[in-house]
Regions:
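Short amphipathic alpha-helices in soluble, non-transmembrane regions
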Residues: 8-17, 40-48, 102-106
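Glycine-rich, often proline-containing surface loops adjacent to acidic residues and nearby aromatics
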Residues: 27-28, 80-91
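Acidic (E/D-rich), amphipathic helical modules within compact regulatory domains
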Residues: 39-65
């Protein structure tokens, strides 16, 4: 458990430097992930007993795997997009500290299985500074301060 990883701190990290509320679907990515990382990650997610997982593949469209690390918190992995592995979740679903901790647990699993860092940026800022980083080397999940406005 990361003591500084609270729902309030999470909301602050995703808020713009000028205090504007963020768009609700931040962009997550497994840094430098490859197509060959998708299979092991899919297997780990579907076999984790503490996750509820469903997969959707609509006739050749991009396969999406939805994972619920806690009731009411859904993380969508877009495996059909190929590499790097991309995902998103809805900030509005992270109501309390338990929800944020459950998300962090899921992202640590992702980082551990693939052996690569995981970053989450505010929605639409795919090349911007991450608000959240999970370090593969340590398993540490940390929030980064918003850049100065």
């Amino acid at each position: 458990v990361d003591d500084d990883l609270t729902a309030a701190a999470f909301r602050r990290a995703f808020r713009d430097a000028d205090g504007v509320e963020p768009m609700p679907l931040p962009d997550g990515e497994v840094v430098d992930s490859l197509g060959s990382d998708i299979g092991p990650l899919r297997d780990a997610l579907t076999h984790a007993r503490w996750l509820h997982v469903t997969e959707q593949d609509t006739g050749g469209a991009a396969a999406t795997l939805a994972a619920w690390p806690s009731t009411g918190v859904q993380v969508d992995f877009f495996f059909g997009w190929g590499a790097p592995i991309a995902f998103d979740f809805d900030l509005r679903q992270l109501i309390g500290d338990e929800d944020v901790q459950a998300l962090a647990r899921l992202l640590r699993l992702v980082s551990s299985v693939v052996g690569k860092d995981v970053v989450v940026r505010p929605e639409g800022e795919r090349d911007g500074q991450p608000a959240l980083v999970v370090e593969a080397s340590t398993g540490r999940c940390r929030l980064l301060p918003a850049p100065p406005g």
